[in-house]
Amino acid sequence: MGVRFRQKLMSGGATQNGSFCHGQNQRGVTDAPSFADAADGLSFGIDLPPCAEGPGLLLTADGGRYQGTLFGAQGYGEGELVFTTGMMGYQESLTDPSFAGQVLTFTYPLIGNYGIHAGASESSGVWPRGVVVRHAMHQPDHRHSIAPVEDLLRLHNVPGIQGIDTRSITRRVRELGTVLCVFGPEEDEDLLRSRLKEMTSPDLEDLVEQVSISSPVVLNPGALDVLDQPLPRLGALDCGIKFNILRNLCKHFEVVWCPPETSFDILTNEYQIDALFCSNGPGYPAHTGKATMARNTLAQAVQARLPVMGICLGHQLMGLASGLQTYKMRYGHRGANQPVVDLKTGRVSITSQNHGFAVADPDAGMLAAHPSGACSPPGENLHGAEVTVRFVNANDRTVEGLDLVGHPSFTVQFHPEACPGPHDAAPLFEQFRDIVDRSI
């Protein structure tokens, strides 16, 4: 039941009873579509598959062996082992499409103490292929809780393991880099080792295709501003977009939520957009699938001098379109406490981030790189605009944002919508609206 329900809730399908319908209360909007929230099945009382239990074992490709106890859905968890440092916001992290293909370790020792809340997810699915925690709370204490976290995992057929020394895992990943892993019943150790030996990197998969919407839809048709004037129309390329990004965009634009392969001609001729946005998402930025299609659309938009904003993977795709390389980081930035420096103003913002790849600095090169040396091949500038680094990470000096000189376009590696996380960078959405207004 969990697998079928997860497939039904993929971000491409509108539903009459979905929790996500941000255009519903906007001025001028009379018929806004709604979309399923990952926790809707818990609200509807859908029967859940059996819960995993008993001794579990987690193995890493570099020889690590960790014992724990299984929870969540039955089955095997396997993927790239990563960690996130957020103390809260586990529901938002579990439903963030950028975690597709990964086994997510929470460094905070207690996960699930306030349960799962209706309408608080960031997408229609749970995307990690496994979850690792020190302790999962089975009896949450919050008036708005509808279920414990393990029920959300069962609903979406995602296995978990607890009782693990997550501090040891975090140190291992920080020192040696992200690594493939597998976990399951301890009695299946031989099978686990066999699965680990045969496993291939999720970076080889077209993860963007797995998490993106299947057909275009206008989220807030007819949206008006406070003066009853039509909002500018924005095309939002979905590479794995979070609901809270869409909420923020709908405050400033009439949003056309589009698949990543949507061509520039369709966006301009059929939907007549005034600006373009490219979202966050999972996987290898230079993958030849849907990510490359979105990159080409970004380049065409810049050539046409259309205002463009990119976040996270959208930032990396703009870097590739600008002739810069992208590369795999040692352990990435995943958490809600990453300091970012604006090189233009000197201001430091604390930001929420979730990425394992970065854009190479034009001068300093590939900072905080993974030991594997994985990176995209050198490319050409597809749009012809000069690019400068606008933001850098205060900890490791990696690139956190780009400005396109002489063009109404910019990108950031961090998440200004910050769900979860601090809101220091939230004004970037309003700044982009100002850029669009000046360009129309």
Language model: regions and residue ranges:
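RNA-binding accessory domains that recognize and position tRNA/RNA substrates
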Residues: 2-13, 17-18, 22, 27-265, ...
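A glycine-centered loop/beta-turn motif at secondary-structure junctions
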Residues: 401-439
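Proline-centered loop/turn at the N-terminus of a beta-strand
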Residues: 159, 233, 307-309, 325, ...
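Active-site-proximal beta-strand elements of phosphoester/diester hydrolases
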Residues: 233-238, 351-352, 410-414
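Residue-level structural signal for beta-strand termini and adjacent loop
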Residues: 70-72, 109, 354, 404, ...
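Catalytic beta-strand/loop cores that center a nucleophilic Ser/Cys/Thr
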Residues: 347-406, 440
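Cysteine-nucleophile active-site neighborhood
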Residues: 270-362, 421-431, 435
